Amino acid sequence: MLLTITEIKDEATMFRKLIENCDKKNTSLVIDCFPVMSCKLSSMLLSYHFLMLWPDLEIKGVSAATGKNDRITHYWLEINDIVVDITGDQYNLIYDYELTNKIIKGRPFPSIHVSHNNESYLYNIFKIKETHSFVYGFPEIADDFIDEMAHGYNQLLYK
């Protein structure tokens, strides 16, 4: 299935709004300080959403880091050659002393970043540490976490 960048961005934007507007204290896998420290959990929920819409997709989760001892981490999704990041704006909120100069100089970061990976700033800031492959049913993920994703997803969509 070949999705357009516009279709992906529209869904990512809608999903980000659902997270922003939800009851963060009572929604599974969404934390109070969203978007700060929320990149992996939010990306997992977004991958669940994408796979509910488009079950034939293969999504890549990208774990990356920068800074001294790779202490600043980030996580985003890729669909084919398209980067999808719905928590990059956390780096606008984190104190300068906790970040690298490269991150500080890149501000302000958008809340939703969807672009072709060869045009994405993420690869200039972060080093990829590992990637994960997500397909419908999440065969590589523990059942209890899949259940939590389903619960959080339903809370977001049907609140």
Task: Please describe what each predicted stretch is.
Residues 1-159:
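A structural boundary/capping signal
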